[in-house]
Design a protein with these regions (language model features):
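A SIS-like phosphosugar-recognition module
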Residues: 165-166, 177, 204-248, 252-256, ...
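Conserved short alpha-helical segments that host acidic/polar catalytic motifs at enzyme active sites
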Residues: 1-246, 250-251, 259-296, 334, ...
């Protein structure tokens, strides 16, 4: 993986592809490459570079003309970052070029057979295997060459293929890794993400797993990997190209943190029903009888989405009185879980394409489970695979680390919990209480954002820490987990999160002045328990930064946040910790939008 972009038409292709790669930079990558041709060309022309897209652009010669091309940003899975391992990959006769997201599971076996037949490999990647297999196919058409090759491989892929002898087309295919077609006026685009397309077209077709497409300048057709024709109905992308710009901010992360009041307002808009103190979530495909029959809720996600799911599980238990828990999707799918028909499964993913979550959804569907999706991207794989769901309406999130999407996902869970609760036993007065709390959120988030200068000063005091501990109790624990993840993702400071109740069971051994502790201390029924934890840390000379609703005398510093309903407090307590991580990383000179070794959308195992 990580980013694919392609074009066929009449325009000069290299600038279009480089622009597309720049719009995909947020996904994370370590190298980039481009290959082009045209109907009048005698072959393929390729340039690759380890590093950033700007490094690739610097290598592209001035005379590099063509009207058809594919390009790629790579995030290493097989082989270290290098010019040789960067995509595209060319066949030995320089006729076949391919870019690929995904992992070929049987690449080693296929590679050994090709080497035995005399094929010389120039890279360590699994992708190069595909290139040689396509080149060696005796099929008469490029489509059939690709189909024959796909029958030989095991694994996941999103690919785009060019051939010097078929310069009038690009062939693409999908299995487990996103491929989106962009439909223009006598021109066609392909990408792994609509971000690369929206500057040129809003009409898109998202391929399903097991589907292929042939793109020509003036038309396209879709079909299965078995050769059967499929029907492709274009949809309109709602996001504008400007949504992917920084809008005057120094980083995408800062922009996205600052957008949270508007983002939360957007996820609430049109969903609240004051008459009955409930909410309407039209895409759930879950009627009242089915909702009353739910005996358990299991939430699946990865990383930040998993943390949002932990808060969501607490909201569902509290408001709907249904037993609920959350689990990393990457663990769930490998432990042969018992799938209960009375359990509602909820899959959470910002992109809607996260491989481990998607694989868990597909396994659940095979076993007859009911699955809802909570995603940000309309038309994504999880949205299509699930029985129903809700969109979080955060808008495009470009920074690799998630901020506004995390917040909106938790708000979406609050809406889901309220919806289920009012169908079951939640009172009108409690429904009204939660609705009033939800309506306060945008204004309260704005209040927190206005304290950024104070948080920036605190960040400077803690930026020299080599390690940090985050603690919280019950609702506060997932906030601690997410804050810990944010800090390690962008500052590279080691951080751990523990339930505050577990301090005596091991973590107290770590407490010393050099290890700051960030404590989540809401003004709820556990306030005194949390204060006792601060006492234990202070007794061992630990430094404490508290996030609380009022100053904490045992803390060295306190970030004070507005009080909402107890159930909704985690949403607000996470916001200042996003800013803390941001400014600590900034003080350390980190590449905040593109942290090392990370990708925005993890579409491989």
């Amino acid at each position: 993986m990580c980013g694919i972009v392609g074009y066929i038409g009449k325009r000069d292709v290299a600038p279009l592809l480089l622009e597309g790669l720049q719009r995909l930079e947020y996904r994370g990558y370590d190298s980039a490459g481009i290959v082009i041709t045209s109907p009048k060309s005698t072959g393929l022309k390729m340039v690759k570079a380890k590093g950033r897209v700007r490094d690739l652009e610097a290598r592209v010669p001035k005379r590099f003309a063509g009207t058809t091309g594919i390009a790629h940003t790579r995030w290493a899975t097989h082989g270290a970052p290098s010019d040789e391992n960067a995509h595209p990959h060319l066949s030995a006769d320089n006729k076949v070029a391919i870019v690929h997201n995904g992992i070929i599971d049987n690449a080693s076996e296929l590679r050994a057979k090709l080497v035995a037949d005399g094929v010389v490999f120039l890279s360590e990647t699994d992708t190069e295997v595909l290139t040689h297999l396509i080149a060696r196919s005796q099929a008469e058409t490029l489509e059939e060459k690709v189909r024959q090759t796909l029958k030989l491989i095991e694994g996941t892929y999103g690919i785009a293929v060019m051939h010097a002898d078929f310069a009038d087309r690009i062939v693409v295919a999908r299995n487990g890794s996103p491929v989106v077609l962009g439909i223009g006026e006598k021109e066609m685009f392909v990408a792994s993400d609509v971000a690369a397309l929206v500057a040129h077209t809003r009409q898109v077709v998202t391929l399903d797993d097991g589907e292929m497409a042939t793109l020509k300048a003036d038309d396209f057709r879709t079909y299965t990997t078995e050769g059967s024709t499929t029907t492709a109905t274009p949809t309109t992308v709602e996001w504008e190209a400007e949504s992917y710009d920084m809008g005057g901010h120094d980083t995408y992360m800062h922009k996205e943190i600052s957008e949270q009041p508007e983002a939360v307002d957007r996820v609430l808009r049109g969903r609240i029903d004051d008459r009955f103190s409930t909410v309407h979530l039209g895409g759930l495909n879950l009627d009242a009888r089915e909702a009353r029959g739910i005996r358990r809720v299991k939430i699946l996600g990865c990383g930040t989405s998993y943390h949002a799911g932990l808060i969501g599980a607490g909201l569902i238990e509290s408001l709907a009185r249904i037993p609920a828990d959350a689990e990393p999707a990457s663990e769930f799918r490998y432990r042969n879980p018992v799938v209960d028909p009375d359990t509602l499964y909820v899959a959470v993913s910002q992109s809607g394409e996260t491989y481990d979550v998607l694989a868990a959804v597909q396994e659940l569907k095979r076993k007859g489970a009911r699955v809802l999706g909570v995603v940000n991207v309309v038309g994504s794989a999880i949205a299509r695979e699930a029985d129903g769901g809700t969109y979080v309406h955060a808008g495009p999130e470009v920074c690799v680390v998630s901020t506004k999407c995390f917040t909106n996902t938790v708000v979406a869970f609050a809406l889901l919990a309220l919806h289920l609760g009012r169908i079951r036993d939640l009172s009108v007065s409690d429904g009204k209480r939660i609705i009033e709390g939800l309506r306060k959120l945008p204004g309260q988030i704005s209040e927190i954002l206005e304290t950024e200068d104070e948080i920036k000063k605190l960040a400077a005091e803690y930026a020299d820490a080599k390690s940090m501990m985050f603690i919280g109790r019950v609702r506060g624990y997932p906030v601690a987990l997410e804050a810990s993840l944010k800090l390690k993702e962008i500052s590279y400071i080691h951080a751990e999160a523990y339930p505050a109740s577990e301090l005596k069971h091991g973590p107290l051994a770590l407490i010393e002045p050099a290890l700051p502790t960030v404590a989540i201390v809401p003004n709820d029924d556990l306030l005194e328990k949390n204060r006792a934890a601060l006492e234990e840390i202070k007794a061992r000379s630990g430094r404490i930064l508290a996030v609380a609703h009022r100053e904490q005398e045992k803390a060295d510093h306190t970030i004070v946040v507005p009080k909402n309903e107890d159930e909704l407090d985690p949403i607000l307590m996470g916001i200042p910790l996003q800013l803390l991580a941001y400014h600590m990383a900034l003080a350390l000179g980190r590449d905040i939008d593109k942290p090392r070794n990370l990708a925005k959308s993890v579409t491989v195992e």
